[in-house]
């Protein structure tokens, strides 16, 4: 009996030519030669390009909309941006659980894309609502409350859709590669590199096009373009449906395949606590021969949970130290669309007497660095490293992550030094009390920190994707990628929290805060130095945990 997409958790394996634990869109066993691998992931990558064009068309210049169109202060605007980015990056944990437990990745992609498109449409509508005052009045006192309410509803509807779409699309794309096939297994490592390459194309394009439209034509048009792009993303994804492989989630868990992964993992910890008085000899006979040797205290749970659930809990628990260390990188990651952008808005951005570069467009250098460095990494660095280390990926994923964190430290140091020079230039030209004046210092001074930020992304972000996808059992891979994305989400929350606390602490007794609306009196340089110190601690701990980490599969 064949199965359908809606019931893709089941299926039969009928011959060696079929891909194990995989069916096509009609529910028949997937044929290796006509499905999956690059022919399928190409469609998901194209959908990623269009989706990232939409998302970063909103995210990269959002702080400008908050401060100029809605009249918010720099600190409040930065906090609002961080809260929204954090929500969008944290929601994959929930959607990943729903996809792994109930809907499956394909149906979750369809559902969340509808939320996404509705949110973008509503955002476009909110931007068409005019202000209630003339140019002489302050913007914040005359913005329509209806406009603000619709805007925030739209913004978080976008976050709801984006959070599920991206985690399931990435996991679905990786599912197209069969780990049991040597060639496809090797290609999967390259898949994460080229996926990030494709994503960067979408991000670069929208920063060049959409940000310019928003600041020079209209916000309504600047938000309508991302809405159309998201519609294109859904169309491109559906275009590849006949080539896709749909995971049947095999591996001996048919009886419990719809359990919520959080419930399963929690059940293991509860059972281990209840059976804490049991001796190892009481449980060793119940464990399979391939049981991992780490976190042996969880083996006691096998008395009331099955061995597969115990292994799932061990796999997730082993990721926690790396996840915690990576949160600091998430905080650093939050700075480019917020304070980096505001920093650039005060500097000389003129290309000619009539043309100025939007401050948000400087983020293009992050994307350019990624686009240039990923081919170098994949085609030059990896083969050389592979010949030395004999590892398929050249270096381990944790070595890759550690390298990226180290580069982020240098990026923060450079950002602090450039900000110190910008403040000195403002003082030298008597601009300290002129918040709207252009500091006579070229915005090109910011380019090195953006480029280094992009190179660190190639190491850390791609490494985190591959690490969290590969180190969890197959049935938890949406959740694995959700854990990776939650690093960015919680990093944004932590950044927002830090900004609020520092703003409160440094503005007492009439002092000028680090994040004053007048950036010529503020001290973003102090904040960057603080992040450099925190990143240094994160780097030390990551290297420590990387040395003792036991991979679930050869790296």
Curated annotation (Swiss-Prot):
The protein's name in its UniProt record: Protein NRT1/ PTR FAMILY 5.12
Pfam families, sorted: PTR2
Organism listed in the record: Arabidopsis thaliana (Mouse-ear cress)
Domain of life of the organism encoding this protein: Eukaryota
Membrane spanning residue stretches: 53-73, 83-103, 109-129, 148-168, 190-210, 221-241, 315-335, 357-377, 401-421, 443-463, 482-502, 526-546
Gene from which this protein is expressed: NPF5.12
InterPro entries (alphabetical): MFS_trans_sf (IPR036259), NRT1/PTR (IPR044739), POT_fam (IPR000109)
Induction and repression of expression: Up-regulated upon nematode infection.
Location of Phosphothreonine modifications: 108
GO biological process assignments: nitrate transmembrane transport; response to nematode
